[in-house]
Amino acid sequence: FKKEFDQHKTATRVAKRMKTTVEAVLADWALGNLYSTTLGSMLHKYIDNFYCNKRVEFEGNFVGLGFDEKQKILETLPVLIGYFQNFYNDNKHLLCVKTEIVLGDISDTKICGMSDLLCYNTDTEQLEILDFKTNKRMEKSSPYGDLFYPFDDMSEGEINEYTIQLNVYKYFVEKYTTCEI
């Protein structure tokens, strides 16, 4: 639903602006991506294990990262865990039904994804789908333009993209079960 990111074209432009090589820019992006996915995976593992009453061991999860990135994760992860603990403490009305739930539609859309948490809201007496995000940015709009049809009235920002994602998951649950989200 959005324009594909042309990594080489963008890296060429960034390299020229920063007076470095395209390879250096791509390597920097790869390391940043590895850092982000490692941090996100570790937080998601913590949350999943928290709801399953399991202890989390984080050793060995730093493959491919340098010392600085590992240190940054060790500093950032406790902060993110604190945010999750605050969320949990502030939302005792949300009871975990299932973590890491796979949702998909093999007959029509051929789309599949995974949500972090399916919970029951005791206040509204309804199910809710939650997905925890660790993005660097969480914007509603972006300078990169609008999404493609049928979302062409929405900007390409992370908030809009994740809103669509959760609504697609909602559609799957309601299509294939008797549950309402």
How should each PLM-predicted stretch be described?
Residues 1-108, 112:
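Nuclease catalytic cores
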Residues 101-181:
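Mg2+/Mn2+-dependent nuclease catalytic core
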